[in-house]
Amino acid sequence: MDEFQRNSNKHRSWQQFFLYPLFFREDLXAIAHYHHLDRSGSSEPTEILVSNFLSFLTVKRSXRRIRKQNNSISLLGNSDSNKLIEYNKNSSFQLILEGFTIVLEALFAMRSKXFXKGMDGWNSFRSIHCIFPFMEAKLPHSBYISDLRVPYSIHPEILVRIFRRWIRDVPSLHLLRSILHEWKKSFNRENLQKALITQRENTRFSLFLWNSYVYECESFLIPLIKRILNSQSLLYGSFPDRTHFEKKIKDIVLFPPHKISPKKIWLLKDSFIHYVRYGERSLIALKGTHLQVKKCRYHLFHFWQYYFHLWFQPYRICSLELSKTSFSFLGFFMHVKMRPLVVRAKMLDDLFITDLITNELNSTAPIRSILFSLAKEKFCDISGWPISKLSWTSLSDDDIXDRFDRIWXXLFHYYSGSINQDGLYHIKYILLLSCAKTLACKHK
């Protein structure tokens, strides 16, 4: 893959215009075959591994036959002999899809690097461990927050149009269109709207589609929001701490002089924005006025409706004032709380005591949701009373204790920074008593 990316940098025009011949190279099909075996693992029976290898040979022979044909042949035909459209049953389709994804991933990696270099003034963090320190440092200084859910109901033709912006190879686009439409047919009608995006954890191709879709959204969304904030500064009332005045109201000639109040000074308010995303949830923290928040919300609605040609449900974006309401993100309930501090300042021979008020971000663990999950997994009843885990009674004592210990350690490590530690110890009590009842039920 590294060698392919280095060669593609030298011949970028060839890479963009002639991708279709790469999909039928035998070495690319071999790479896809080994990727498919590594993901399946070595625990599969020998018959399945042999079947996959034979399918690889079938794809290899098909690629040779297609190269020798003069007429164009559709890989996804409806003939009885060609079973490539059987997405869940035939691994030949998986290998072709794997090779198709490998080529597109290399192009996507180079395109995303160019996008990151062009975003001046924006710091990008790609680890979940950076989210909480970032939010604790930035959100207390923000006024509003917009909770945005990325739309997942998207038509295959919209994805084809996204790839058309950076791939101009017409045969490759036709192949992508055929794959997307045949893949969409493999889902029933109930899951038709969520087939392309919400199944992203199943295959490498699904994950690539999701990353491409989110990248396309953010590549236009972030500059759009930045342009909205920098387009026009909004005026607001007098603040005595500001010494650098942009304009005074007496200098404005749009109003008669007798209607101007000399006691009120109008200043320009500085605005900034922070953007955080995890999965399909995005948070846009904004320091500014309520009018700027409404303006940003208006442009977000029209961005998805006119750019992606899909209806953006109003409930998918919610604007909140941080000082009055709380919000949920990554399994926490978060709210900004004012914290009063008493500061002693000494100037020459005098000692002053001043009150300083700062904002801090408090996170609360959702104890009720955790109890509901434990009740669903039969660790306790709906009221929170511990019960024995009957499905684990066939395990050894060490395995039972180890499983309970891992559950508690995972919960404690994730929610250890929350302010409601009493609720976490109540969860620990439920797990300990459920473990004891499970062991007692086993040795009864």
Curated annotation (Swiss-Prot):
GO terms for biological process: mRNA processing; tRNA processing. InterPro entries: Domain_X, Maturase_MatK, Maturase_MatK_N. Coiled coil: none annotated. Keywords: Chloroplast, mRNA processing, Plastid, RNA-binding, tRNA processing. It comes from the Eukaryota. It is found in: Plastid, Chloroplast. HAMAP family: MatK. Belongs to the intron maturase 2 family. MatK subfamily. This is Maturase K.
